[in-house]
């Protein structure tokens, strides 16, 4: 049996736990999500695909992997705001899929009970579906394993507390640099083949989904593969991994959508959203009814905030959900952006999808964005209050910005003639 070799990055964090934790506390099942990789080391590892099975099992709770590679085989890792010549931030600039070199490629399958979703029962079933789109995958090696959160049980009652339907399938891509294009194209073709559906979030957002997570395509993203930490009173089902020998995955064989296919894809997505429009409106109205009271803002304003979020703009009073389910508004991030740079959180529009689905990124241009890795990937732009935006643009303090804006507004008013005033009114 033959399995291709691949090089990836092993990450070790000094303090934070980089895997999921589960515990029973006073009869209640509790889960804690992985922490932030902010102070640690990176080391490149090379092995055959089948050797990943014992390797993953051997990792400690402070370790994870990254599919991309740094320039140097060994590196000290930090967050972007503390990056120096000797300390590397975990960003796309520093972790890359190298052109014409093999890289790990992951297909992530999660249980989804949304209306219209397709349940995938095994790795072989998913590969068979992909084979209808990409016949050459029939000869490609893969290793499949259950998600680290799968099969957690109560030792007292034998009750299954987490789903055991989720799994990861690993291949070795022949040309790592083509992985982002391949995943994006495969996602769209799966939707065209009838495997797309709309998940309506609690807040009424319509989120396109298919049988794989379309966002697992970024070289700097953490892959939490170490065994979950479980406390007394819990156990985990033994779910054996699956191995199939073969060769590398030639991603280039999967061609981009033609212009006609792109139009069909857009029409299909439009139809899927139309079919769930009423459900989404009901969910949104219910969400606004409850959240407007919790947040102390008007229903009209909250509706505006959510509509902006649907357009990938998160306004200053949008509520972000952190990994531990605590919340923070965008304005707090804007007030102290460097403290939030690199912080992992839940997807802005679908916090129920799980932890570590997105990351806050503070750019050198002072713009703040959230990169969501969930199901296809989205980039959200964060906007502060007008005074904070002006302060950022002018590189001044908030007090100085407030005075400058006041003077500027006075000047505008003085320069208005009567007709301008009538037009504005």
How would you describe each model-predicted region?
Residues 107-117, 127-128, 148-195, 207-425:
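Modules that initiate DNA replication and primer synthesis
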Residues 144, 204-207:
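A short glycine-rich, hydrophobically flanked beta-strand micro-motif that places a catalytic Asp/Glu
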């Amino acid at each position: 049996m033959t399995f291709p070799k691949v090089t990836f990055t092993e990450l070790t964090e000094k303090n934070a736990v980089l895997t999921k934790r589960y515990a029973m506390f006073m009869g209640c099942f509790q889960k804690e999500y992985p922490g932030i990789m902010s102070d640690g080391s990176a080391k490149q590892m090379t092995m055959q695909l089948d050797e990943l099975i014992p390797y993953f099992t051997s990792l400690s709770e402070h370790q994870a992997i990254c599919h991309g590679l740094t320039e140097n085989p060994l590196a000290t890792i930090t967050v972007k705001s503390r990056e120096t010549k000797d300390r590397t931030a975990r960003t796309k600039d520093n972790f890359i899929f190298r052109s014409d070199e093999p890289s790990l490629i992951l297909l992530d399958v999660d249980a989804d009970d949304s209306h219209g979703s397709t349940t995938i029962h095994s790795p072989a079933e998913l590969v068979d579906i992909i084979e209808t789109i990409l016949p050459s995958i029939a000869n490609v090696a893969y290793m499949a394993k259950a998600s680290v959160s799968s099969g957690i049980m109560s030792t007292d009652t034998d009750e299954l507390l987490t789903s055991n339907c989720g799994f990861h399938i690993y291949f070795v891509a022949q040309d790592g640099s083509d992985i982002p294009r391949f995943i994006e194209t495969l996602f769209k073709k799966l939707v065209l083949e009838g495997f797309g559906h709309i998940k309506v979030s609690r807040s009424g957002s319509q989120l396109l989904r298919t049988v794989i997570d379309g966002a697992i395509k970024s070289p700097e993203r953490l892959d939490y593969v170490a065994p979950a930490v479980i406390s007394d009173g819990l156990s985990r089902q033994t779910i054996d991994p699956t191995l199939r020998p073969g060769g590398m995955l030639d991603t280039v064989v999967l061609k981009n959508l033609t212009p006609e296919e792109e139009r069909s894809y857009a029409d299909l997505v439009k139809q899927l959203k139309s079919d769930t429009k009423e459900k989404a409106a009901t969910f949104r109205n219910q969400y606004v009814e409850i959240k407007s009271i919790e947040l102390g803002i008007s229903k009209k304003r909250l509706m505006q905030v959510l509509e902006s979020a649907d357009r990938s703009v998160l306004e200053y009073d949008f509520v972000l959900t952190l990994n531990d389910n605590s919340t923070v508004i965008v304005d707090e991030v804007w007030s102290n952006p460097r403290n939030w740079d690199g912080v992992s959180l839940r997807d802005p529009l679908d916090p129920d999808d799980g932890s570590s689905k997105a990351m806050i990124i503070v750019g050198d241009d002072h713009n703040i964005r959230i990169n969501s890795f969930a199901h296809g990937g989205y980039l959200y732009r964060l906007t502060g209050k007008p005074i904070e935006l002006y302060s950022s643009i002018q590189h001044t303090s908030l007090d100085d910005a407030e005075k400058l804006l006041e003077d500027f507004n006075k000047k505008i008013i003085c320069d208005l003639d009567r007709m301008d005033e009538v037009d504005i009114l």
